[in-house]
Every structure is written in structure tokens, then in C-alpha cells.
């Protein structure tokens, strides 16, 4: 199974550090068929899945690392600079 397939589904996201705003309960990622969107307070930010990277059209990249069963640690980067870190877990 490829990473894209493993990432398919709906994910809850929460901040773990850096300059990202609080996210618990207000941010979700929806992923399917090699693309997806981050939904924050009703606003959608679309991305494409590139292995374990989520690439947004405006220079933002979320780099993911497996972090347990149905969970990933993430680093949000803008033009190669770290903005912050987050953890995403599969929504039930």
C-alpha cells in the first residue's frame, strides 16, 4: 500500500509547537485519490499528496512522519522554513 492510500481518510489535527495557531477541534484534513484539503473554521486549503508531503499551491508543505497506529507527526514548512509542528490522528 502506498503512503497516499494510507493517508486516505479524515484526520483530526492539533498543534504541538511553533508558530501555528491552536488547532484542536477546529482543523481537519480530508485526503483521497492523491489530493485533499485542510479545513479550518470552514475554510478549505487544497493540497496534493506527494508521498508523505502535503503540498499546497502557495509554498506551504506539511511533512509527515508515522507516529503510531493511525497517527502522524507533522512539520509545517513555508518556503523551506519551519512554521510549527502538529500531530494528526485518524478521525473516528
Describe each PLM feature range:
Residues 18-19, 30-71:
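Contiguous, well-ordered beta-strand patches that form the walls/edges
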Residues 69-72, 81-83:
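Coil-to-beta-strand transition motifs
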Residues 1-39, 74-76:
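Tryptophan-anchored aromatic micro-motifs
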Amino acid at each position: 500500500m502506498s503512503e497516499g492510500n494510507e493517508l486516505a481518510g479524515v484526520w483530526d489535527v492539533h498543534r504541538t509547537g511553533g508558530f501555528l495557531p491552536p488547532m484542536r477541534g477546529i482543523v481537519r484534513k480530508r485526503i483521497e485519490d492523491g489530493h485533499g484539503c485542510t479545513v479550518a473554521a470552514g475554510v478549505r486549503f487544497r493540497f496534493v499528496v506527494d508521498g508523505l508531503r502535503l503540498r499546497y499551491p502557495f509554498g506551504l508543505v506539511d511533512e509527515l512522519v508515522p507516529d503510531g497506529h493511525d497517527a502522524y507527526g507533522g512539520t509545517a514548512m513555508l518556503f523551506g522554513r519551519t512554521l510549527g509542528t502538529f500531530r494528526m490522528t485518524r478521525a473516528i
